[in-house]
Amino acid sequence: LILFPYIVSVFVNGVDPEETTNENFYIRVKASEEEEADGIAEVEWNEYLTGVLAKDVPADTETEALKAQAVLVRTQISRALQRSTQAEETENQKSDRTGNVSDVILEIDYLSQKEMQDQWPADEYKKRYEKYRNAIEATENEVLFYNDTYAWTPFHQSNTGMSRSAEEVLGSSEFPYIKVKECPADKESEEQVGVFTFSYDQIQKKCHHFLAAETDGEKAAAGYSFKDFEILEHDSAGYVGKLRIGETICTGDQFRDALSLPSSSFSFAESGKKIKIITAGNGHGMGLS
């Protein structure tokens, strides 16, 4: 953990760190056209952190868990700022902005106060907002570092009871701290199991970008059936690593993304002339839940 706001000021603007505080540092973010004509909003630092936390983490999360998530959110945004700024410097781009406003435009989703008021029950708004804001303020300046840089801190809603290894999912040893860990409480999550039914034609259309070799030939004319779907391997946490669709081999994550499934931990069941997909967990399964 380090004193964060001073460091980010140097990374982003090169201003005197002693003159920058959380209260006068602003982030430029993507905003809806309803809120800002040019689609860009300038949001006070802690307000943005609060909005990202509210977007990602359920309001009924226990206080200490919410504080842990607040540290992850702050680290995530700090990492995004650092990487974006370094990319600009590499391209010799110079900022023409002055003061404590980031020149980088972030696209990490957040809830504005207006969106919170629109989405939350009126009698819950103040209580929820203060809970998120308090978590941000209680962990002020706290971020996670790994090897002298901001750590990658992925978050997901729930998993199969085991979190996933970044090395298995990404095929890279860059994040050795994202490991397989038991998470027994996730098995009790209300969103633990999902059931989705698709026609074979729907799957063929949704997965066309990686089934291209089969979309114009005999298989396209004949269509798929249940026997064309086979799970070939799982990773250490029980998520689908590879599966076969007809003659195509794809990853579980490719399949999840194509069908907008909540998780790549899934199984198949025949359902008349359709296929039923049963999922476990919600999200990519890496990091904290």
Label for each model-derived stretch:
Residues 1-288:
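Conserved, single-site charged/polar hotspot
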